Amino acid sequence: MSEKKYVAYVGSYTHGSSRQGIHVYDVDVENGTLTERSSVEVSNASHMAVSKNGKYLYSIEDEGVAVFKRDKNGDLSRINSVNIDGMRGCFLSTDVDGKYLYVAGYHDGKVTVVHTHKDGRLGSLMDGVFHTGLGLSLIHI
């Protein structure tokens, strides 16, 4: 029997009065089952990423990005959130040192760089670049 415990974070779109956008599940690898343990309030958690050190979970939310502290059991507690000055993001990634969080969005073609603090807080927006045009140019013969 496996002694190691696994946790799954499932992000979802929210609607109506429900804002429970992240669901926390215990994963039983022996039996292949998921058991919902809790849910966390965040609107439209369409993408999530874990920090390089594993201590924090970043989530897209309606107007920006939220960060949650992961405790030793995998439970989440909100630290803070930042607005990304644009439409909703849809992808998150950190740099190799964990100093910056990159937020990309389909709707407005923007990539935003957010500073991350050692204590997990999201800081100021460092940069934002909008893509212009229609993507790959086609060569006509």
Language-model region placement:
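Residue-level detector of Asp-centered blade-edge/turn motifs that repeat once per structural unit
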Residues: 2-4, 52-53, 96-97
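Short, solvent-exposed loop/turn segments at conserved positions within beta-propeller repeat blades
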Residues: 15-20, 60-63, 106-109
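Short loop/turn segments immediately following beta-strands, especially the blade-tip
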Residues: 26-31, 68-74, 114-123
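A short beta-strand motif characteristic of beta-propeller blades
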Residues: 35-40, 77-82, 126, 135-136
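Conserved small/polar residues in nucleotide/adenosyl-binding loops
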Residues: 139-141
